[in-house]
Amino acid sequence: MSKLGKFFKGGGSSKSRAAPSPQEALVRLRETEEMLGKKQEYLENRIQREIALAKKHGTQNKRAALQALKRKKRFEKQLTQIDGTLSTIEFQREALENSHTNTEVLRNMGFAAKAMKSVHENMDLNKIDDLMQEITEQQDIAQEISEAFSQRVGFGDDFDEDELMAELEELEQEELNKKMTNIRLPNVPSSSLPAQPNRKPGMSSTARRSRAASSQRAEEEDDDIKQLAAWAT
């Protein structure tokens, strides 16, 4: 059995040790990534230093230059191994994060499903149908009430419009006849007026003005009679 197998076998024999939580495992992986990142930086610096030493010795100290190049190769090999390890750890961390996220999502969905089930247990489909039917009926009643309020209320006073118009015309005619009766017409003389003497050249100005005023009054009375006759017809 390989040493790696013995290591995992020995580690798994401890039943008292509880499995780590996803949060703890993620913390450990991030710490490992940080440590390997620092190791990468150290190796890259050492590689640059060994290259500088190899260039410095060059052909003057060939043995020292070769030793520097050998160390550079070892550091590059370690750096390659660390790159592979970091890739594996990064993949493992992302997978664990996804698993943890999926677990939390599943737990929350299960919690919500239980809550929904608890709510639905208190619901009866028959009661819901009855409630919706009752709501519909109440809405119909409210609509009928609104329509009833919007209609014209006559309180049973259904009269014939033509009959009312005829009665109104009769009242207007009676009022018109009453006004005609109250109007006093000018008295018409029963006998013919005496003939007026012809004006002589010697008629005074006072007599002429009196005659003109009498003639004007007679014309005004004739106009009033004509207006009353036209209004009566």
Swiss-Prot record:
Residues 125-183 form a coiled coil. GO terms for biological process: autophagosome maturation; autophagy; late endosome to lysosome transport; late endosome to vacuole transport via multivesicular body sorting pathway; macroautophagy; membrane fission; midbody abscission; mitotic cytokinesis checkpoint signaling. Residues 1-153 are annotated as: Intramolecular interaction with C-terminus. One of its GO terms (molecular function) is protein homodimerization activity. The modification Phosphoserine is found at S210. The keyword Nuclease does not apply. Belongs to the SNF7 family. Probable core component of the endosomal sorting required for transport complex III (ESCRT-III). ESCRT-III components are thought to multimerize to form a flat lattice on the perimeter membrane of the endosome. Several assembly forms of ESCRT-III may exist that interact and act sequentially. Self-associates. Interacts with CHMP2A. Interacts with CHMP4A. Interacts with CHMP4B. Interacts with CHMP6. Interacts with VPS4A. Interacts with PDCD6IP; the interaction is direct. The acidic C-terminus and the basic N-terminus are thought to render the protein in a closed, soluble and inactive conformation through an autoinhibitory intramolecular interaction. The open and active conformation, which enables membrane binding and oligomerization, is achieved by interaction with other cellular binding partners, probably including other ESCRT components. This is Charged multivesicular body protein 4c. It comes from Homo sapiens. The lineage of its organism: Eukaryota, Metazoa, Chordata, Craniata, Vertebrata.
